[in-house]
């Protein structure tokens, strides 16, 4: 019974056929466009429009991102995950800035955690950017039980629901079983102003002291190249909507960004990431050659396991883009399951936009069916849901 709780549903997942993969995640060759070949610009616009109106997923080959920059970023990623566990824990994710190390792991028994692990969350004040009391924010050791008393006593903000007793976990008697199995390291723009450093979902970054300067330089260069390319893709997306190329410029000014180094240990029938949509406008993901991505197909209504082209960037649109385009462009459900027998490494870049930008359909795309929402509020809601929506509680006799 217990093992069934952590297995992915195989009833609604299968391998995508070549035709299905081309439909739900088409390949777009940027080479002719980068080389300014005749007709390439118009062709890219048409291909982007078709992909974004379908699932919002597409593959990019021959992008202007330097292969050496990507290679060095993956080298840094593997270097980080090979650090001693205790050292990684010293960089545990700060839940206000969304920076640092996060672990989603197997279950542990309540009451048997190491006494040095700070498990209780007494509240987080998002508005003030501070934490109640003097205790440090706990590491994101998902699978550890968060005592109900620490969440229901009214202290701090209401970021977490009062009845939430586990985070991304399945409660079974005195056990807590993680629904997800991965470890990750979050970082973002390394050159933010003092004012930006005080805002949610932004720096300062947490760099490991023993990794050396080359580690930081490799990841900063990766971030900067991905940001520049993401901004260019946004201008192409604006054109694909028959808008001015600068239609997204205000949204993209001084943007909130996030990058995650991700390692998914091989775990048959165990999800590395639960089904979800991204909160951002645009995600660009580099990956190794180990497959694991599953996309919800709107035609068959089942998850299809896809096999991205070697060296391709996986691009997908998030919830912010769906709102900006009045749902003309899609933010699709997806998840990860690595049953390859090898670790899977990916490095997604998230373009979340200016933290103060009010998200609503762009002019010319029709009236909004929902209330406009600031990027900061949308990200906060998404962040909260990520700690509650995948929690399963069981009544045990």
Swiss-Prot record:
Cellular component, GO, one term: nucleus
Fe2OG dioxygenase domain segment(s): 255-353
MF terms (GO), sorted A to Z: 2-oxoglutarate-dependent dioxygenase activity; L-ascorbic acid binding
Keywords: Iron, Oxidoreductase, Vitamin C
Keyword Repeat assigned: no
Superkingdom classification of source: Eukaryota
Record GO biological process: small molecule biosynthetic process
InterPro entries, A to Z: DIOX_N, IPNS-like_FE2OG_OXY, IPNS-like_sf, Iron_ascorbate_oxido_reductase, Oxoglu/Fe-dep_dioxygenase_dom
PANTHER family per record: 2-OXOGLUTARATE (2OG) AND FE(II)-DEPENDENT OXYGENASE SUPERFAMILY PROTEIN-RELATED
Assigned protein family: Belongs to the iron/ascorbate-dependent oxidoreductase family.
Name this polypeptide is given: Sexual differentiation process protein isp7
Gene: isp7
């Amino acid at each position: 019974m217990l093992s069934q709780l952590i297995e992915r549903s195989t009833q609604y997942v299968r391998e995508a056929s070549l035709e299905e993969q081309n439909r739900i995640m088409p390949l777009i060759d940027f080479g002719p466009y980068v080389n300014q070949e005749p007709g390439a610009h118009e062709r890219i616009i048409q291909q982007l429009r078709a992909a974004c109106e379908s699932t919002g997923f597409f593959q990019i080959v021959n992008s202007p991102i330097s292969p050496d920059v990507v290679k060095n970023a993956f080298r840094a990623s593997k270097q980080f995950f090979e650090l001693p566990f205790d050292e990684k824990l010293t960089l545990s994710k700060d839940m206000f800035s969304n920076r640092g190390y996060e672990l989603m792991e197997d279950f542990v028994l309540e009451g048997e955690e190491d006494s040095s692990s700070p498990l209780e969350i007494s509240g987080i004040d998002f508005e003030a950017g501070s934490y109640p009391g003097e205790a440090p924010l706990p590491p994101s050791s998902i699978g550890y039980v968060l005592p109900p008393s620490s969440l229901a006593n009214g202290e701090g903000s209401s970021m977490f629901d009062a009845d939430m007793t586990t985070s991304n976990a399945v409660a079974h008697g005195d056990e807590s079983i993680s629904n997800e199995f991965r470890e990750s390291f979050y970082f973002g723009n390394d050159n933010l102003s003092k004012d930006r450093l005080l805002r949610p979902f932004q720096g300062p970054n947490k760099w490991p002291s023993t990794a050396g300067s080359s580690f930081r330089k490799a990841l900063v260069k990766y971030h900067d190249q991905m940001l520049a390319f993401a901004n260019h893709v946004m201008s192409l997306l604006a054109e694909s909507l028959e808008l001015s190329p600068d239609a997204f410029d205000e949204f993209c000014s001084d943007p909130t960004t996030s990058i995650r180094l991700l390692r998914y240990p091989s775990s048959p029938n165990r999800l590395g990431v639960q089904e979800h949509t991204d909160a951002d406008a645009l995600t660009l993901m580099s990956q190794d050659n180990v497959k694991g991505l599953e996309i919800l197909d709107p035609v068959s209504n089942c998850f299809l396991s896809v096999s991205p082209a070697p060296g391709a960037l996986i691009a997908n649109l998030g919830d912010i883009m769906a709102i900006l385009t009045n749902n003309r462009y899609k933010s699709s459900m997806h998840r990860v399951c690595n049953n390859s027998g090898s670790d899977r490494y990916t490095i997604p870049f998230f373009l979340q936009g200016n933290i103060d930008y009010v998200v609503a359909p762009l002019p010319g795309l029709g009236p909004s069916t929902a209330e406009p929402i600031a990027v900061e509020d949308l990200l906060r809601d998404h962040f909260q849901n990520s700690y509650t929506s995948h929690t399963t509680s069981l009544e045990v006799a």
